[in-house]
């Protein structure tokens, strides 16, 4: 679903922009601090209701304004959507889809599936399991309509159980939570396992394209011993959980692990190889979405040239162009975009950014 138009008001140093966008590649060139990453951040905010750089909304609102407003037009074949989001310094948020209020962030996220590739994105590989669960759950959200409600209810029950652990004296008092929690945990884990197994061949194929010298393996770990009953584990671990004050075992501990030639990737790959593997994983997931749901996702790539040599940049550009996705790419200079051959395509757009102002 490509964005055909983007309006930004008072988002960081971007005070007033109205952009007509290419459905193919959109290149954003500018010096550090010019506002090029803020443009990607604004697009991300439209699809997630949050920033990928800051959790404090007042830091995102322009210092001279009381709110920021983002608006976009989304085109998909014969269908068109108008989406908008306003965030005030007070913390209030207003969402609109086709002019109607009462929408949720999940509604925006469903309309705008997107993958983000940033220098900080290596946490997918060398960070904690939280980042890899988020990777899996992104795919589940877009593939299974029932996943979001199951996941949200699971989070709610875990929070309630953890609070109850500080109050109950016996397991009998906690058991009503555990009955429902165990059911949801099994459902979410089964969806995660099924999705991970379906995604695995796509990951292996894409990694072979980018890193043919390595054998990349993936494995899903549900967060408790496979083949055991989660309800029994909760009951057996009651005293331990009560002493710790939280639920130690379960789907909230799930992981999706990556190995290179049988070893953890974070232990054996260089920074450049990790960056390429991260790109491969994001591309594989986007292509799997197309294969399963016939839906394209956007790709937001910040600092395209970072830690990739010219040959690897060409490989990434080739694969992105083959995907047919809408892509937004930032770079400091035009020369860094040579591997993407932007000069040869009249269907691409090139924007120059300087002090929050864009010229095409």
From Swiss-Prot:
One record GO biological process: DNA synthesis involved in DNA repair
PROSITE patterns (UniProt xref): RECF_1, RECF_2
Keywords from the UniProt entry: ATP-binding, Cytoplasm, DNA damage, DNA repair, DNA replication, DNA-binding, Nucleotide-binding, SOS response
Cell compartment(s), UniProt: Cytoplasm
Source organism superkingdom: Bacteria
Ranges in a coiled coil: none
Record bears the keyword NADP: no
Binding site for ATP: 30-37
Gene Ontology CC annotation, any one: cytoplasm
GO molecular function: ATP binding; single-stranded DNA binding
Entry function: The RecF protein is involved in DNA metabolism; it is required for DNA replication and normal SOS inducibility. RecF binds preferentially to single-stranded, linear DNA. It also seems to bind ATP.
Annotated family: Belongs to the RecF family.
Name of the protein this chain belongs to: DNA replication and repair protein RecF
Organism: Actinobacillus pleuropneumoniae (Haemophilus pleuropneumoniae)
